[in-house]
């Protein structure tokens, strides 16, 4: 049976992650409060930010910036967007 969580991002019961994505308290918090859908959406957005803003994951400041944006993304706050990006029309 699929484990469900009350997703912090989408404010509804959705399938949860299979395991914490990070070690420690941060990973456990994501595991308990973020759905698979929200995590997949974050990974797409994270990739866009890394590419468009040319972030270097070897740089501690860039990792800290990205983690801050992840927190905003999941909390429903305003988060950084790639300049000039227009989502595809459905």
Swiss-Prot record:
InterPro entries, per the entry: Fe_traffick_prot_YggX, Fe_traffick_prot_YggX_sf
Give the UniProt entry's GO cellular component terms.
cytosol
Q: Which GO BP terms sit in this record?
A: cellular response to oxidative stress
**GO molecular function (one):** iron ion binding
Supply the Pfam families for this chain: Iron_traffic (PF04362)
Asked if the Swiss-Prot or TrEMBL record annotates the protein with the keyword 4Fe-4S, the reply is: no
Instruction: Give the keywords, sorted.
Output: Iron
Please indicate if the UniProt record lists Hydrolase as a keyword: no
Q: Which family is annotated?
A: Belongs to the Fe(2+)-trafficking protein family.
What does the protein in this record do? Could be a mediator in iron transactions between iron acquisition and iron-requiring processes, such as synthesis and/or repair of Fe-S clusters in biosynthetic enzymes.
Q: What is this protein called?
A: Probable Fe(2+)-trafficking protein
